[in-house]
C-alpha cells in the first residue's frame, strides 16, 4: 500500500498549482512526483491523430490513465471529465485519456458516451509504466498487473504539476478542475 505524503515536495510548495488533499492525491508509484519532468510519450488517438508530450509543449494538459473502456468506474471517470470539459477548455487545458485498449474500442467508447477528448492507445503499457501508472494492484482480493487509475496535470514547461494515484473516481474530475483553476490563477499572478 503506498504511503501518503502529508505535504507536497518543496518544489510543489512554491506553486499554487499543486492539488494535494489527503482524500484524493497521493504520490504516484515508482517515484513520479510534483516537479518531475513528465516522461515523453507519442501515442495514437482514436481521433486519427498522434499525441505527444513534445506536441503539447507550452500547454498545460491533463493526462489520465484508466484500466479499460466501457467498465463502470472508467465510464464514470470519463463522463465526469466530459462534463467538466467546457470549463477545462475555457482554461485552455486539453484532456487526454490513456488505456491499453485498441483504437476501435476507444472510438466506440468515446462515441457511446459523447466524450469530447481523445483516448490514446498504449497497448504495451510502456507510457503507463513510465508514469508509474502500471503495476501490481488488487482486484476482488487478487493481485494482478494492470493500469493503476492515475491522473497527471502537466504544466506548460513539461513538468508534473499535480498527481493523483491511485484515483478514487468520486469527485476526482472536480478536484482536477480545481487544480487547473489554481494553476491558471498562479500563472496569471506570476506573469
Residue ranges and their predicted role:
Residues 1-191:
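Chalcogenol-based redox active-site neighborhoods
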Amino acid at each position: 500500500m503506498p504511503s501518503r505524503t502529508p505535504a507536497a515536495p518543496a518544489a510543489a510548495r512554491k506553486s499554487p498549482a499543486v492539488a494535494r488533499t489527503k482524500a484524493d492525491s497521493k504520490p504516484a508509484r515508482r517515484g513520479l512526483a510534483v516537479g518531475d519532468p513528465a516522461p515523453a510519450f507519442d501515442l495514437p488517438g482514436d481521433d486519427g491523430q498522434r499525441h505527444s508530450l513534445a506536441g503539447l509543449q507550452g500547454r498545460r494538459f491533463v493526462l489520465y490513465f484508466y484500466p479499460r473502456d466501457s467498465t463502470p468506474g472508467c465510464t464514470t471517470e470519463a463522463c465526469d471529465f466530459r462534463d467538466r470539459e467546457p470549463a477545462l477548455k475555457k482554461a485552455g487545458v486539453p484532456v487526454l485519456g490513456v488505456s491499453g485498449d485498441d483504437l476501435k474500442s476507444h472510438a466506440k467508447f468515446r462515441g457511446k458516451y459523447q466524450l469530447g477528448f481523445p483516448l490514446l492507445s498504449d497497448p504495451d503499457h510502456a507510457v503507463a509504466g513510465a508514469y508509474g501508472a502500471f503495476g501490481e494492484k488488487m482486484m476482488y482480493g487478487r493481485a494482478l498487473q494492470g493500469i493503476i487509475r492515475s491522473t497527471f496535470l502537466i504544466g506548460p514547461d513539461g513538468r508534473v504539476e499535480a498527481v493523483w494515484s491511485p484515483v478514487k473516481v468520486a469527485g476526482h474530475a472536480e478536484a482536477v478542475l480545481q487544480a487547473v483553476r489554481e494553476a491558471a490563477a498562479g500563472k496569471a499572478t506570476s506573469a
